Amino acid sequence: MIKKLLYIIMVALLASCGSDDPSPSPGGEPDKPGGETKPTLLGENLIVCNEGNWQSDNGQLSFYDGTTGVMTNKWFRKVNGSKIGDTPNDILHVNDTLIAITVNWSNIIQYIHPDGTACGATENVPNNRRMCSDGRYLYVTSYAHKCGSQTFTRGYVAKIDLKTKDVVATCEVGWEPEGIRLYKGVLYIANTGGYSFSETTHDHETTVSLVDSETMTLIRNIDTGCINLYGEISQAGRYLCINSCGDYYDVKPRMLIFDCETNTFNVLDFPCTYNTTDGKLFYVVGSEYSYYTNEYKYYQRTINPATMEVKEGVANDVVTKKLNELTSPYEIYISPYTHNIYFTDAGSYASAGYLYGYTMKGEQLFKPQKVYINPAHILALPVYGK
């Protein structure tokens, strides 16, 4: 509960982004016109990024072997002999050999191979938040006002060359920028203004910043009219799913469906705190907190961004029922490889949480797996056969 209270108070100090490349297709489908086929997809392993408690330096990675059914906690430490750091905040599968992890309060971006071996770090992007990539560069949001010798009034986006792990360009955006996505060469950044409670220089943000990814120049800011655009951003082609937390008092949380082709958006009157996509639909678990009642209200919805049709529930009746039984939903994730759906329960926010997995038909993939404190991010790694 300590961590959750910090989350509420700080608004945005705690919570996988990707590029605009299409999701990987299942194995066995033709990869090239010449008839060459990809290896057969046999299954997948999972990495769970546990944030731990902010400022406690107890973040962890958990690894689930889908072949053996064995969960390994403290995975990064067991592989590398050292801790991952304080509050790992995002994890991104960049390519077949590289995974990036923003470790927020340790002020580093840690790189690992899929076997967990550390293979470098970027250390001059403090208070780093979320990531996306085009395969050559990594784009990272930061709440900080400094990157190396550069200073900024607001927050910024850093562009990192993945060959050298060096920052090659930056662009100042809004106050406390959070989620980031890439579409047709344009970066879309959701700004929160989450420090407005302690910084009198600004209010909560309502803008989405558009940045040219090649030149790293600001194209424009789009005012959404929705405050505190904090949390995960899922992307289904041209559409983005963006959460608006509200102010936990009188301004209610909402969510946006943002169309990157037209740079227009639709607003829905419920939050999408935890959200994911199968490439066509958005699946959301919204968490609404009120200081007046000191209580949470949860929402489960499925949204078709092309038609704006909204349905109650997530995926199927089994998953919806299980989500309703959780004490503290903390992440939801659909694998781009199998379309299996995974989600976590943070429980008390101070002790180990649990990972759950189901097929889209509602079949349980494994018994609930004990992970670590605040399991906030999930990444699937495909297992291929010849």
What residue ranges belong to the model's regions?
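Acidic, serine/threonine- and glycine-rich low-complexity intrinsically disordered segments
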Residues: A169-E172, P177-Y289
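Bacterial Sec-dependent N-terminal signal peptides
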Residues: M1-L46
